[in-house]
């Protein structure tokens, strides 16, 4: 079960963000952006001189149970991107994508 699902554009603005407890919506929005800052710091450190390879480690990014959720989300995102009426960079407003996210959030693993 997911508590928050976000799709972030390459330019760091949200294309889609949804959280289960709606009263914590701003908190999750903040957490998504701060986690992106950690990834940006690790990537920018790669360009600097002689970086210790252990410093680039972000942690286990795909536990087995989370891999299925990511695959389902990625397949649905690919369907949105392949829609000829979707303009890349616009907010995701697909009903099918929203239904898939809803099913992921209420699904008990």
From Swiss-Prot:
Q: Which SUPFAM superfamilies match?
A: SNARE-like (SSF64356)
Query: Can you say where in the cell this protein is located?
Result: Cytoplasm, Perinuclear region; Endoplasmic reticulum; Golgi apparatus
UniProt entry keywords in alphabetical sequence: Cytoplasm, Endoplasmic reticulum, ER-Golgi transport, Golgi apparatus, Transport
InterPro entries xrefs:
Longin-like_dom_sf, Sedlin, TRAPPC2L
An example GO CC term for this entry is: Golgi apparatus
In the record, biological process GO terms are: endoplasmic reticulum to Golgi vesicle-mediated transport
Which top-rank group of organisms is this from? Answer: Eukaryota
Subunit text: Component of the multisubunit TRAPP (transport protein particle) complex, which includes at least TRAPPC2, TRAPPC2L, TRAPPC3, TRAPPC3L, TRAPPC4, TRAPPC5, TRAPPC8, TRAPPC9, TRAPPC10, TRAPPC11 and TRAPPC12. Interacts with the heterodimer TRAPPC3-TRAPPC6A.
Q: What does this protein do?
A: May play a role in vesicular transport from endoplasmic reticulum to Golgi.
Family per UniProt? Belongs to the TRAPP small subunits family. Sedlin subfamily.
Q: What is this protein called?
A: Trafficking protein particle complex subunit 2-like protein
Task: Record the organism.
Answer: Pongo abelii (Sumatran orangutan)
Gene name of the record: TRAPPC2L
């Amino acid at each position: 079960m997911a508590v928050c699902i976000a799709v972030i554009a390459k330019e760091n603005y949200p294309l889609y963000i949804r959280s289960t407890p709606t009263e914590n919506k701003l908190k999750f929005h903040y957490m998504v952006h701060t986690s992106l800052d950690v990834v940006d710091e690790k990537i920018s450190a790669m360009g600097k001189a002689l970086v210790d390879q252990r410093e680039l480690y972000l942690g286990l990014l795909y536990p087995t149970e989370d891999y299925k959720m990511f695959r389902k989300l990625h397949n649905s995102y690919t369907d949105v991107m392949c829609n000829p009426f979707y303009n890349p960079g616009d907010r995701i407003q697909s009903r099918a994508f929203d239904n898939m996210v809803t099913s992921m959030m209420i699904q008990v693993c």
